[in-house]
């Protein structure tokens, strides 16, 4: 792709680093921004800077937040004894959109994947185990994607907490094997949470 401007080329190259954005799409987006009033592009740039500098991770669940404890964890109307374990913040948003879950979350920040060099120590697993062992949790719901990495992560955590006197469950397999949670429709995802099964059954049937 030939550019008549080095500044344009640099902007397109940076935009193309975003997930799912190729060079042609990046070019369209950059050219669109060039046609917008300067105050609009300034506002967009400032919003991104403010987000990057201001957003933090909740000290309880590792969800993104504007304050130390996120809105979900600080909500007294949620059941704090039921913890739904998810891979990342997109899964929290997907489950919240179903309106079927009133517990709290624990965001791992990924899943165990040796091929990608991601082990248990790179994830928020130890804080989850500590939370369970503190006695403040009555049920853990495993809601990671139905992939080999997701199942490996679920089983690793289960082994750490299986001797604790809590319920361990897994979302029902309405989510197709290999699918990421965020792509499931709200009805299917909502039902899979409501119809969750004992975790021991989930891996015995695999």
From Swiss-Prot:
GO aspect biological process, one term: DNA recombination
Zinc finger (C4-type) residue numbers: 58-73
SMART domains: TOPRIM (SM00493)
Entries under Pfam families matching the protein: RecR_C, RecR_HhH, RecR_ZnF, Toprim_4
UniProt key word Repressor: no
GO molecular function, one term: DNA binding
Source organism superkingdom: Bacteria
Residue ranges of domain Toprim in the record: 81-176
Record's keyword terms, sorted: DNA damage, DNA recombination, DNA repair, Metal-binding, Zinc, Zinc-finger
Assigned protein family: Belongs to the RecR family.
Protein task: May play a role in DNA repair. It seems to be involved in an RecBC-independent recombinational process of DNA repair. It may act with RecF and RecO.
UniProt xrefs under HAMAP family: RecR
Protein name per Swiss-Prot or TrEMBL: Recombination protein RecR
Organism lineage string: Bacteria, Pseudomonadati, Bacteroidota, Flavobacteriia, Flavobacteriales
Gene that encodes it: recR
């Amino acid at each position: 792709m030939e550019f008549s401007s080095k500044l344009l080329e640099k902007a397109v190259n940076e935009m193309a680093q975003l997930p799912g954005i190729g060079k042609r799409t990046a070019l369209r987006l950059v050219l669109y921004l060039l046609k917008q009033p300067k105050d609009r592009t300034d506002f967009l740039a400032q919003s991104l800077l403010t987000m990057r500098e201001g957003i933090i991770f909740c000290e309880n669940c590792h969800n993104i937040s504007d304050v130390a404890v996120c809105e979900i964890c600080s909500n007294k109307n949620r059941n704090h004894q039921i913890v739904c374990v998810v891979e990342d913040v997109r899964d929290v948003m997907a489950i919240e959109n179903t309106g079927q879950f009133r517990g709290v979350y624990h965001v791992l920040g990924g899943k165990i994947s040796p091929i990608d060099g991601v082990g248990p120590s790179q994830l928020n697993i130890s804080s989850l185990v500590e939370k369970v062992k503190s006695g403040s949790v009555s049920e853990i719901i495993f809601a990671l994607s139905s992939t080999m990495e997701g199942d490996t992560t679920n089983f690793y955590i289960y082994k750490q907490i299986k001797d604790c006197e809590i319920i361990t469950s897994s979302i029902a397999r309405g989510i197709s094997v290999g699918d990421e949670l965020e792509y499931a429709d709200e009805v299917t995802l909502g039902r899979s949470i409501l119809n969750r099964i004992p975790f021991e059954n989930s891996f015995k049937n695999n």
